[in-house]
Amino acid sequence: MGLFDRKEKYIRINPNRYVRNGVDHHVPEVPDDLFAKCPGCKQAIYQKDLGQAKICPNCSYAFRISAKERLDLTVDEGSFQELFTGIKTENPLNFPGYMEKLAATKEKTGLDEAVVTGVATIKGQKTALAIMDSNFIMASMGTVVGEKITKLFEYAILEKLPVVIFTASGGARMQEGIMSLMQMAKISAAVKRHSNAGLLYLTVLTDPTTGGVTASFAMQGDIILAEPQTLIGFAGRRVIENTVRETLPDDFQKAEFLQEHGFVDAIVKRTELADTIATLLSFHGGVQ
């Protein structure tokens, strides 16, 4: 060892093992996802205590769930038939890093895009169905999301089916610029054609539903349901406060606030949504 060589200051230890009475013991690692912090009550919740519906046992906060989890909770087992899976996302503006971000998100989520579309039965009631997944780039609305939802309405018109959409989105996808914003008008036109055919359109607003999705098809349903405490809005709270220079109510942009002011028809617990949707579909000439 040289005179000026750096010496180790500390003893290296392995936190996953220890020796007691001359016997080497291994300490099991605690999985990173064993507990979840509830955004509602701020408590650490054992994941298994959340149950399939991902509801906090302390405050009943509904955790955000994936499209796959939503399907399992909502539709009849084995009834879902996915549609419009072959549409590929492109990069119309050559936005730097966009395709790489898409590839990484697809690998992480197992989804091709931010919305899953298809046909299913809910308690025996047949419907066209779309579920947005906030795990995919915050379920932002790009050209593929717009195309899939538009095609779903067109399919529903041909098959004379109602449409149920579970919305969740951070808004328009900025990487696609004006092409993303165009989807608002495109889907809205499809909603109108579906309505002209005398068919039911039901939306379920889930946390969060914001931006261009709120400003278009999320609020165009014949019946608008929402999960409790869902964040619903267009611009962000701070943007609005800075613009109007007023302090907004604590419950501003929450589902309960919107129901009180007539923008939401009913707030339904996640565990009761399937029954509620099926009942509404049956009232409006449901298809078996």
UniProtKB/Swiss-Prot annotation:
Coiled-coil regions listed: none
GO terms under biological process: fatty acid biosynthetic process; malonyl-CoA biosynthetic process
Swiss-Prot/TrEMBL cofactor(s): Zn(2+)
This protein's record includes keyword NAD: no
GO molecular function: acetyl-CoA carboxylase activity; ATP binding; carboxyl- or carbamoyltransferase activity; zinc ion binding
Annotated metabolic or biological route of this protein: Lipid metabolism; malonyl-CoA biosynthesis; malonyl-CoA from acetyl-CoA: step 1/1
Catalytic activity: N(6)-carboxybiotinyl-L-lysyl-[protein] + acetyl-CoA = N(6)-biotinyl-L-lysyl-[protein] + malonyl-CoA
Subunit structure: Acetyl-CoA carboxylase is a heterohexamer composed of biotin carboxyl carrier protein (AccB), biotin carboxylase (AccC) and two subunits each of ACCase subunit alpha (AccA) and ACCase subunit beta (AccD).
Name of the molecule in the record: Acetyl-coenzyme A carboxylase carboxyl transferase subunit beta
The organism of origin for this protein: Streptococcus thermophilus (strain ATCC BAA-250 / LMG 18311)
